[in-house]
Amino acid sequence: MSEELTPQQVTRMTKLQKRLRTEVGRAIGDYNMIEEGDRVMCCLSGGKDSYAMLDILLNLQQRAPIKFEIVAVNLDQKQPGFPEDILPAYLDTLGVAYHILEKDTYSIVKDKIPEGKTTCSLCSRLRRGTLYGFAQKIGATKIALGHHRDDIIETMFLNMFFAGKMKAMPPKLLSDDGANMVIRPLAYAREKDIAEYAALKGFPIIPCNLCGSQENLKRAAVKEMLVQWDKQHPGRIETIFTAMQNTAPSQGVDREQFDFLSLQRDPDAPMSGQVAESDLPAFDFVDVSNNGHINLDAAARIDVVSTYTPE
């Protein structure tokens, strides 16, 4: 920690750690993220999220009923001004196994992306490829990334608004080649809790804008939208995330998710709730013809007064 905390701050930090530990533990259980004997490669960027993820995973490792190994890995992408000593010094204090990799993806990105454009997308793809390869080299069975609940929701709206897809970040993902399993232990955690916890813990944060890349304006706009919703409608973000876990393909319009083409009614199926006509209650009759005023006749019934069948 960078400075002494007050008793109130210590209490708050303990409460946040317990909350994050509970949420991470629940996510791990719900999605079977970590199993007996796993070697978990914990990817560190030097930001608040990955620091918090490592901290909570190390805490859970001491309490978990299963045995698993944690290996911290950072990729130095040779961005100008990257402080090479910060992460090794911090990791040494934890006593956790770690690797610092070096690969000049910065030069590749600057060569491919026009000046003034955001480089984050290409940078992350190059970083992901390097980390996937290293995970196989060290025999990692899981690759842990620090994306949290807000990242997942933001990604869903970004894909909805700008890509025409209902797609987010899954808590657990098998790579396209089937060789790597990616997990997101912070999937249930709120960013504001992580930020507050990181500040209280005094993690040595490394800025993410050393490359000089412009902020992703679309993501920033979606993030601000969600921040305002959270202020104006408490509980809405939680409801959105709950909805993401309760999809109903048969109630949507995606033909790939549900087989509408072969959907057929069963002519032999009994009518649902079939009762004798004499047992049917009277229906209220609604008349909206009187200048928009609604008149209810509680005694009125709906009767079939005539039918016509064309020959």
Curated annotation (Swiss-Prot):
Short name of any one Pfam family annotated for the protein: ATP_bind_3
Comment on bound cofactor: Binds 1 [4Fe-4S] cluster per subunit. The cluster is chelated by three Cys residues, the fourth Fe has a free coordination site that may bind a sulfur atom transferred from the persulfide of IscS.
Chemical reaction(s) catalysed: cytidine(32) in tRNA + S-sulfanyl-L-cysteinyl-[cysteine desulfurase] + AH2 + ATP = 2-thiocytidine(32) in tRNA + L-cysteinyl-[cysteine desulfurase] + A + AMP + diphosphate + H(+)
GO cellular component: cytoplasm
Motif PP-loop motif mapped to chain: 45-50
Predominant location: cytoplasm
The keyword Ubl conjugation belongs to this UniProt entry's keyword annotation: no
MF annotations from Gene Ontology: 4 iron, 4 sulfur cluster binding; ATP binding; magnesium ion binding; sulfurtransferase activity; tRNA binding
Pathway assignment: tRNA modification
HAMAP family in the cross-refs: TtcA (MF_01850)
Function: Catalyzes the ATP-dependent 2-thiolation of cytidine in position 32 of tRNA, to form 2-thiocytidine (s(2)C32). The sulfur atoms are provided by the cysteine/cysteine desulfurase (IscS) system.
PANTHER family in the cross-refs: AMINOTRAN_5 DOMAIN-CONTAINING PROTEIN, SULFURTRANSFERASE-RELATED
Misc: The thiolation reaction likely consists of two steps: a first activation step by ATP to form an adenylated intermediate of the target base of tRNA, and a second nucleophilic substitution step of the sulfur (S) atom supplied by the hydrosulfide attached to the Fe-S cluster.
Stated family: Belongs to the TtcA family.
NCBIfam families with a match to the protein in the record: PRK10696.1
Protein name: tRNA-cytidine(32) 2-sulfurtransferase
